[in-house]
């Protein structure tokens, strides 16, 4: 019985020892695997901690970048508003400059027309001054003629006065001779009186007739001379009045033309001053437009440079953040 039991127990013990050894081996291998798994878990936990830290950092950076993007968008919107305002102001300035240029062209045309009118007025004034000089010369000639005729009238009046005086003297002489004859007849006798009376009757009528004829002729001549003098004086009075009226008209026309010339010169000066003012204003507007265009170009260059510098989507940091976030998403999906 004992031998049979021993024979039956020995293989069982051997089998049990083999199983123990295999179990020990398995336990050792399991312990080693457990250590490896624990090391892996520790490393994975460390990696996850690092990943979570990197994720938080990436989220912070993403938030900061989002804030910066919002700020940049606001700045861009403000810059766009400023650009729109500056472009509208530049367009207004250009419209005002066009208006000023049109006004300048109009004022130039007005100045040219006023200058042409002033030149024509000056030519008219020169022509009128020449006409006035001619009229003054003719007036002087007429005045000389009038003075000459006045001298002639004075001479005729003197001749009339001398002839009247000579007539009176002749009459007085005739009366004196008659008195002397009558006195001589009264003193002499009757015979001589008869002879003298006969002589007087023969001579005196003839002498009286001749004297009367001469006196009548002289009176007619004097009357004709008086009529001629009156006609000449009236004619030359009318001529002098006409010349004086013409002279007054010429003087008035000359004064009116001088006033017109002064007005045209004043208008020309005003037009020149307005053109100078408009030119200065145009130059100022051109300078302002140039400054605005320079500012706009500078702003555009700055914005382009800042856009190139701050292009968020092409930066390496953004690419790193995107790659880290993709890696985190892959790890979470594997879990």
Swiss-Prot record:
Keywords: Coiled coil, Membrane, Nucleus, Transmembrane, Transmembrane helix
Topology class, membrane: Single-pass membrane protein
Transmembrane segment boundaries: 312-329
Gene3D superfamilies: 1.20.5.170
Keyword Lipoprotein recorded: no
Location(s) in or outside the cell: Nucleus inner membrane; Nucleus, Nucleoplasm
Classification via InterPro entries: NEAP1-4
Motif Bipartite nuclear localization signal positions after renumbering to this chain: 239-260
GO cellular component: nuclear envelope; nuclear inner membrane; nucleoplasm
Coiled coil: 55-85, 125-260
Main subcellular location of this protein, as a coarse class: nucleus
Family matches, as PANTHER family: NUCLEAR ENVELOPE-ASSOCIATED PROTEIN 1, NUCLEAR ENVELOPE-ASSOCIATED PROTEIN 2
Quaternary data: Forms homomers and heteromers with NEAP1 and NEAP3. Interacts with SUN1 and SUN2.
Protein name: Nuclear envelope-associated protein 2
């Amino acid at each position: 019985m004992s031998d049979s039991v021993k024979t039956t127990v020995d293989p069982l013990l051997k089998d049990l020892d083999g199983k123990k050894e295999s179990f020990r081996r398995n336990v050792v291998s399991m312990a080693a695997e457990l250590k490896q798994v624990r090391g892996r878990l520790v490393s994975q936990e460390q990696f996850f901690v690092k990943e979570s830290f990197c994720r938080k950092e990436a989220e912070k950076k993403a938030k900061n970048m989002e804030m910066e993007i919002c700020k940049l968008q606001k700045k861009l919107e403000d810059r766009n508003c400023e650009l729109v305002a500056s472009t509208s102001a530049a367009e207004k300035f250009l419209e005002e400059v066009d208006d000023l240029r049109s006004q300048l062209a109009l004022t130039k045309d007005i100045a040219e027309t006023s200058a042409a009118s002033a030149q024509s007025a000056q030519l008219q004034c020169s022509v009128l001054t020449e006409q006035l000089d001619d009229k003054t010369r003719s007036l002087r000639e007429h005045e000389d003629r009038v003075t000459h005729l006045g001298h002639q009238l004075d001479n005729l009046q003197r001749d009339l006065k001398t002839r009247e005086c000579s007539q009176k003297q002749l009459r007085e002489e005739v009366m004196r001779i008659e008195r002397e004859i009558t006195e001589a007849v009264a003193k002499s006798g009757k015979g001589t009186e008869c002879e003298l009376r006969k002589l007087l009757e023969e001579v005196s009528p003839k002498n009286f007739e001749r004297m009367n004829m001469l006196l009548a002729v002289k009176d007619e001549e004097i009357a004709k001379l008086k009529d001629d003098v009156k006609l000449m004086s009236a004619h030359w009075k009318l001529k002098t009045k006409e010349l004086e009226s013409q002279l007054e008209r010429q003087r008035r026309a000359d004064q009116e033309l001088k006033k017109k010339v002064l007005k045209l010169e004043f208008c020309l000066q005003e037009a020149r001053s307005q053109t100078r003012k408009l030119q200065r204003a145009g130059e100022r507007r051109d300078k302002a437009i140039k400054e605005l265009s320079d500012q706009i170009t500078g702003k555009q260059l700055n914005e382009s440079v800042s856009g190139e510098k701050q292009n968020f989507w092409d930066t390496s940091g953004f690419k790193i953040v995107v790659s880290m976030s993709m890696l985190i998403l892959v790890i979470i999906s594997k879990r």
